Design a protein with these regions (language model features):
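Substrate/ligand-engaging "lid" and interaction regions
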Residues: 3-7, 13-174
Length: 174
C-alpha cells in the first residue's frame, strides 16, 4: 500500500514532537516545510528523528519516513507536495499563518489543474481559536472563483481542538 502523504508547516518542537508523532503513528509519510535550513537538511540526511519521552529517561520514540522542504529556497517543491498530500497541518504560530497562505493556495490550484478528486483536510494546529478557519480566509484571498468552487468540493479546514495541542495558557481578557 502506498504511504499516505502529509505536508506539515513548522519543523519546530511542537511540529516534530507532537504532530509529527501523531502523523507517523497513523502511517503518514511526512514532508516538513520550514525555513530553518539546518533542521531541514538534518531531516533530509537522516529521514528520521527521535523524540525523548518526558516520563522516561531511556524511552525514545522514533519517527521515520520524514523529509524536509525549505519553503524559502524551494517553494515549487512545496506546491508539488501539497498537490499530492492527503493531509496538511501547521504549527508555525498564528502570526505566521498569513505568510504561508499564498503557497498553500498555489498547491490547491495545482491539485485543481491536475484534477485531483481526493479530499484534503488542512488543519492549523495553532494556539488560537478557529485557526483553520482563519487560514482558509487567508488562502481564499489568493483564489479565483473557480478555485473556490474546487475548494468547496474537495478541501476541508477543520478546526483543531487547541487545548490538546499546546499546554493551556492563561489569557487575560482583553
Amino acid at each position: 500500500s502506498k504511504m499516505k502523504k502529509a505536508v506539515h508547516f513548522g519543523a519546530g518542537n511542537i511540529g516534530r514532537g507532537f504532530i509529527g508523532e501523531i502523523l507517523s503513528k497513523n502511517g503518514f509519510d511526512i514532508h516538513f516545510v520550514d525555513t530553518n535550513k539546518s533542521i531541514i537538511d538534518e531531516l533530509n540526511n537522516r529521514h528520521s528523528y527521535e523524540i525523548g519521552i518526558a516520563s522516561s529517561e531511556h524511552e525514545k520514540i522514533s519517527v521515520k519516513a520524514v523529509s524536509g522542504i525549505n519553503n524559502s529556497e524551494n517553494p515549487e517543491a512545496v506546491i508539488e507536495a501539497i498537490a499530492k498530500a492527503d493531509i496538511l497541518t501547521t504549527a508555525i504560530g498564528p502570526n505566521v499563518l498569513p505568510y504561508i497562505a499564498e503557497l498553500i493556495a498555489k498547491g490547491l490550484q495545482k491539485r485543481k489543474e491536475e484534477k485531483v478528486q481526493s479530499p484534503l483536510d488542512i488543519i492549523a494546529c495553532e494556539n488560537m481559536i478557529g485557526g483553520s478557519e482563519f487560514l482558509e480566509e487567508k488562502v481564499s484571498d489568493y483564489l479565483s472563483e473557480s478555485d473556490k468552487l474546487y475548494l468547496s468540493k474537495f478541501i476541508g479546514f477543520p478546526n483543531a481542538a487547541v487545548d490538546r495541542i499546546v499546554p493551556a495558557q492563561k489569557h487575560k481578557d482583553v
